[in-house]
């Protein structure tokens, strides 16, 4: 259960990180 929560948190963080990185690169 704890591992699943961590994977979910990492997925959310990676998604936000990718979005911010792409926006910065294009800008």
From Swiss-Prot:
GO CC list: chloroplast
Keyword terms of this UniProt record: Chloroplast, Plastid
Coarse class of the protein's main subcellular location: plastid
Subcellular location: Plastid, Chloroplast
Protein known as: Uncharacterized 3.3 kDa protein in psbT-psbN intergenic region
